[in-house]
Every structure is written in structure tokens, then in C-alpha cells.
């Protein structure tokens, strides 16, 4: 299966408008944003676990990254409520489950072999955040030569300057609204822009965004 698989082309998906599609595991559903492959695939998706559901044990050959959007995600390493950011490096193995139910933004098979450390961060911890000025705050979640991942908070009424991303940029709207080059996007919107893209962010209500850069070029 190929969905938004050409990384040299821009892609925009309003995930809130997509139907949930059943996965091979009972109680686990997906909304696919990008995919290149079948069940073992390079993929970015929203995944929803019904209360009491679980996935079978599995190994992530090329890693897994996810942000908990709702509920509580659990595995052998702990319980992670909404706001937690997790990276499981290539070769890691776990058995995901959720007692109360959960929804996550997850990226699969997108890590190089050089990545070896697990990451567990609570993005709601004030100590992670720094003020960038001009109505922007940032929490750095991961930084390496191959990519940089942050949570970005925009104040109500924010109007930013145009920025160019030489190695591409990916955004997911977690809360609020964000206008990108004049088009307003709301929670669940996902955008991927190729290298050398230029964009301007603004927000009327304020916004919380997941942003990844440097990974597309």
C-alpha cells in the first residue's frame, strides 16, 4: 500500500475527516496519514485502542515514535498518559495495551540504525519548555543529525514570519488552530512539506503543534 509515500511531494490530511479502519488486532483501529508497505511499513498514523485492548508482542525493526493524544498507553516500560512522547529505537520489542483506552500519533520504521536510546518525556512538564519570544514556546523532544522533534506552542493572536526548511518539515495540530499560509487547520491536521519549503504560521486561538524537521532531505 502506498499513501502519501512520495516524500518529495507535499501532503496534507485532515485526520478528523477520516474513518477509523480496523487493524489486525481486535479493538485497535487506525487512521492512515502516510504509508509505504503493507502490515510491515514505513508509516505515520493515528492509532486508537479501545478500553482493555492490547496489541500482540512485536519488534520494531526500524524504530517507533509516538505522542499520546488521549487516554493512557501502556507497555512493559510503564504507563504513559496524554502528553507523553516516546521513542523506541530499532530492534526494541514491547506489548502495547491500554486499560482506559488511548489514541496516539505514531511513526513507524523511520529511524536509522544509529539511534539506540529510548526516550520517555512528559511534554506537559514545564521544565521542558523555553520561551522563544514573539508568542512562541518550544519543548525539544529529540535532536540528532538526522532529525529534530519539538512541541511548539503559539500564543493567541500569533502572527509569525515566513520560515524556510531546507530539509523539510512535518506538522501535526494537537490543540487550537493554526493558519499556514492563510489556510486554517484544526486538531488532527497533519502536513508534510518537502525540502526548501517556505511557510508562515499564525494562530487566532493559540495552538499546540508537534513539529519534526530535517528528516526529508
Language-model segments: which ranges?
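Short histidine-centered beta-strand/loop micro-motifs
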Residues: 45-46, 56-60, 77-78, 96-97, ...
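A short, N-terminal "cap"/entry segment at the start of jelly-roll beta-barrel domains
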Residues: 1-39, 101-148
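Ligand-binding loop in jelly-roll beta-barrel domains
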Residues: 28, 79, 90-115, 184, ...
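Histidine-centered metal-chelating micro-motifs
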Residues: 53-56, 74, 86-95, 159-160, ...
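Glycine- and acidic-residue-biased ligand/ion/polar-headgroup-sensing regions
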Residues: 50-51, 60-75, 165-181
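Surface-exposed interaction/gating patches
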Residues: 123-126, 130-180
Amino acid at each position: 500500500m502506498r499513501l502519501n509515500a512520495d516524500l518529495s511531494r507535499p501532503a496534507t490530511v485532515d485526520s478528523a475527516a477520516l474513518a477509523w479502519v480496523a487493524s489486525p488486532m481486535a479493538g485497535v483501529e487506525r487512521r492512515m496519514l502516510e504509508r509505504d508497505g503493507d502490515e510491515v511499513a514505513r508509516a505515520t498514523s493515528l492509532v486508537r485502542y479501545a478500553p482493555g485492548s492490547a496489541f500482540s508482542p512485536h519488534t520494531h525493526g526500524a524504530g517507533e515514535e509516538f505522542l499520546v493524544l488521549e487516554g493512557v498507553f501502556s507497555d512493559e516500560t510503564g504507563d504513559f498518559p496524554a502528553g507523553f512522547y516516546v521513542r523506541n529505537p530499532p530492534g526494541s520489542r514491547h506489548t502495547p495495551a491500554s486499560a482506559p483506552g488511548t489514541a496516539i500519533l505514531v511513526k513507524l520504521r523511520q529511524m536509522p540504525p544509529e539511534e539506540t536510546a529510548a526516550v520517555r518525556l512528559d511534554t506537559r512538564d514545564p521544565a521542558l519548555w523555553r520561551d522563544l519570544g514573539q508568542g512562541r514556546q518550544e519543548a525539544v523532544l529529540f535532536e540528532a543529525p538526522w532529525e529534530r522533534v519539538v512541541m511548539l506552542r503559539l500564543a493567541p493572536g500569533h502572527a509569525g514570519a515566513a520560515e524556510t526548511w531546507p530539509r523539510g518539515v512535518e506538522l501535526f495540530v494537537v490543540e487550537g488552530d493554526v493558519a499556514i499560509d492563510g489556510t486554517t487547520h484544526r486538531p488532527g491536521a497533519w502536513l508534510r512539506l518537502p525540502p526548501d519549503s517556505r511557510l508562515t504560521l499564525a494562530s487566532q486561538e493559540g495552538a499546540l503543534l508537534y513539529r519534526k524537521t530535517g528528516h526529508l532531505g
